[in-house]
Structures are given as structure tokens and as C-alpha cells.
Amino acid sequence: MNIPTKIAKYEVYKDGTKLIGRGEEMALPSFETPTNTVSGAGILGEYEDPTPGYFNEQELAVPFRVMSKEAASLANMLKAHHLEIRGGIQGNTDDGDIEFTPIRVVVRGLTKKCEPGKLKAANSMETSITLSIRYILIEVDGEPLIELNKIRGKYAVGGVDQLAALEAMC
């Protein structure tokens, strides 16, 4: 048994090429579905009813220490960008040994915002490029955990298509 404890290391790649000069951390996007409030006769109060397969806007901010060629390449708003985040999850075995498990996040999206940052002597610029996500895949140890393709209408959890029954009806 492996008890996961932290991300030991990660790297970000654009079209297979490592991006240099990134910032320290990246927050992965939330999977939040739009809801409707349900209330009325026979219902005690109200509740939020999610719409499976539909998701609110998802963003991924890619931080850089300074404005660079790599950062500027992501500022192109006419072309979807393909990023791959590869890392290692550190964990402890039953015997107390440390083991690493691969994690991979694949993202495709269009540039939504470019923040060149600030200029201050002896400091980083805190440059950031924000992508509007069209596709995301999160894998751990080669197994897909979550996959969402907003354009092609696919949403899978653990490799199981969550919308298969709905697709069969349409």
C-alpha cells in the first residue's frame, strides 16, 4: 500500500518541449457544474440540481518568473495550446519506504489573459498566462481519473463515460 503525501516534482511541457522559468505552483481547474434551484410543492425547502456533463468556465493559470519567449508563446490567442504537466507523487509504503507514482495532466485551451507582470529590481516579474480550458485529462499511474472534452462532449471518470446513457437517447 502506498500512502500519497505530496507532489515531489513536476514539469510543464508545451507541444512536447519543456517550459523553462515557470513559477512555483499551478492550481488545476475546478470541475463545477451549473445548477438550478429546485423548490415547490412536496419539497421541504430547496436544493441545487446539477446538470451532468456541463461545466462552468475552467481556467489554468501558467505562472512564469519573468516574461520570456516561452511565456510569450502562450500569449497567441488564435491557436489552442497543448500543455502537459508531468510529475511524481511521493508516498510511503507500509514498510516506511518512499515510492513515487507518476501523475500527468493534459490540457488544451485558448489564451484568455496575459499578465506580463511587474518590474522591480532584484525581483521576479510574476508573469502569468491564463488559458480557457477546452480539454483536460488527469491520470495517475497511467490510469485516467477524469477526462473532459467540452468540444466533443466527453466526460469520463475512472475511464467510464458518464454521459453514455444520455448520448444513447439523443
Task: List PLM regions with ranges.
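Solvent-exposed edge beta-strands and adjacent loop segments
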Residues: 1-69, 108-119, 160-168
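Eukaryotic N-proximal low-complexity acidic segments or loops
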Residues: 19, 41-45, 81, 86-90, ...
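A generic structural micro-feature
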Residues: 52-56, 77-79, 97-101, 121-125
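Beta-strand secondary-structure signal
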Residues: 59-63, 82-86, 104-106, 128-132
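Beta-hairpin (beta-strand-turn-beta-strand) motif
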Residues: 65-67, 86-90, 108-110, 134-136
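Short, cysteine-centered beta-strand-loop-beta hairpins and adjacent loop/turn segments enriched
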Residues: 69-72, 92-97, 137-143
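Short, acidic/charged, Gly/Pro-enriched secondary-structure junctions
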Residues: 74-105
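Mixed-charge, glycine-accented linear interaction segment located at domain edges/termini
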Residues: 110-170
